[in-house]
Amino acid sequence: MNAFLPCLIAATLSASPVAAQSVFTGTWKGDVAASQVSTKPSIFAITNGRYTCSTCKPVVDVLADGAFHPIVGNPYYDEMSVTIVDPVTIKRASRKGGKPSGDSTVTVSADGTSLSTAFTDMTAANGVPVTGTTKSERVAAGPAGSHATSGSWRATNSGEVSDSGLTFAFAVEGKTVKYSSPTGVAYAATIGGPAAPVTGDPGWTSTTVTQPSPDTLVETDFHDGKTLAIYTMTVSPDGRTMTSKVDDIKYGKKSTLIATKQ
């Protein structure tokens, strides 16, 4: 699902028929400040001129020389570059088929305890970018002699994401659940039915939806048949707030995402 913390990230959100209009039908917008992000850290380092990310899937290991280098197995990009800007800043960029797919500028604070990242996600098939900033707290230092941005970092909810990465819509019509986003990601799935195709996201290819109660939908997302994440989405009694419990199977993370009806 196009979860709205990239990805935090990137990122990107993910029975019985409903007789009256479903409480899910409508446009929703994620609330970054109200959400609870995973406490599992991300780990990367620049050592001896190489950038490594051990928590990336697949693991990344490229020269940090500003040039693009091949990446195999990532559905969103096939090349990546890492540039050391100064002792506290690096820039990362990615592209797929020669076309830019994303970039980020990462800066560590003067005291070395926090990390700020300004990003642009250009993976949307319709060309609509998602931009934003994230802030992380240091969990552990990087290897001796590594760049100051190196280490283990835990995400916080102190960040901003453009509306293109926060807004999504549901339309429940009988047993059919339709999902769409400004970045062109969409599906139409039958409640309790087989996996339905997802369009507009190369890393999310199909989904299933069940409805254990009128106010709850459970969406399970897949990439080429492998489970990515499970979203258990519940709408509040007043119909204004959606709480999504996210079990990110691929990255082993759990989070709670909050969205409000627009």
Which residue ranges define each predicted feature?
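Hydrophobic small-molecule pocket/channel-lining residues, especially in calycin-type beta-barrels
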Residues: 21-262
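Sec/Tat signal peptide C-region and signal peptidase I cleavage site
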Residues: 16-20
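Sec-dependent N-terminal signal peptides
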Residues: 4-15
